[in-house]
């Protein structure tokens, strides 16, 4: 069973959000694909590679915009 929202105090993160996480001394950028029953995060990085992060290993977590996630590229699909 999966969750759609992760609550950490007054902050919440949902499936589809773009986040930046500091875990075990490394910085990860990912889009949340799934939050499991133990609040671990499963997502994909900007290249589409899967990332699994245990909630107990997270030091810092913050939301980011889609533009920050893609490295500042314009993601507008209309021309």
Swiss-Prot record:
UniProt name for this protein: Uncharacterized protein 8
Source species, please? Sulfolobus islandicus filamentous virus (isolate Iceland/Hveragerdi)
* Source organism, top-level taxon: Viruses
Gene symbol of the encoding locus: SIFV0008
């Amino acid at each position: 069973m999966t969750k759609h929202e992760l609550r950490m105090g007054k902050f919440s993160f949902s499936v589809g959000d773009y986040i930046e996480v500091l875990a075990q001394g490394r910085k990860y950028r990912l889009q949340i694909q799934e939050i499991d029953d133990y609040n671990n995060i499963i997502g994909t990085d900007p290249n589409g590679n899967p990332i699994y992060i245990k909630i107990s290993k997270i030091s810092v977590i913050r939301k980011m915009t889609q533009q920050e996630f893609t490295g500042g590229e314009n993601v507008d699909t209309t021309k």
